[in-house]
Amino acid sequence: MKKDIIKAMNIDPKYLEKNNIFIYQDYYYQKKINPQYIDWTTEEATLFKFRQNPGYTNSLGVAKINFPNKHAVYLHDTPKKSLFNEEIRFFSSGCVRVQNIDDLINWLLSDSANWNESLLHEILDNSSTKTLRLDSKIPIKIGYLTAWVENGQIQFRDDIYKKDAT
C-alpha cells in the first residue's frame, strides 16, 4: 500500500488530502507529518506510517478482518464494488478483497452473544474504528489457483505471484 501512496503522491501532490489519508512518524500515530515537507522521490517517504480514516470511502472499504499469518495478509471490503464484476481481479496490494463482507461478518459473529445484523449496520454507519473478537477460532484457508475446471471448461489465469514453478 505504501508504494501505491508514494506513486500517487508523485502524480498528484494532493492525493493524501483528497483521500483523507494522514502521515505519522510511527505506529503510535501521535505525531502528524505535513506531506509537503516530504520528498516523495526518496527512500525516506517509505519510512512514515499512513492512516486513512474509517468509512465508506476508505480504500479498505468499511471492514477489515485480521487473522494470524506470516504474510500480514487480511480480508477487507472495498469502496470500488464494481471490481467484483471484472474477470481479472488482482487489484489489491496483496490482501484479499471480500464481496459482501457484511454477510461474512454476520456469519463469523452469528454465534456471539448479543450479535445481530442491525448491530453490524449501526457499527458500519458510525464511521469509527471498532474491534470485534470472535468467541472461537475459525480456520481460514486461502488457495492460489491458476488453472481449474468451471462448467466443464478448463480455465487458466496468469501466475501473477510466480508460484506455479514451486
Task: Describe each PLM feature range.
Residues 1-166:
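Well-ordered beta-sheet/strand-loop patches within structured domains
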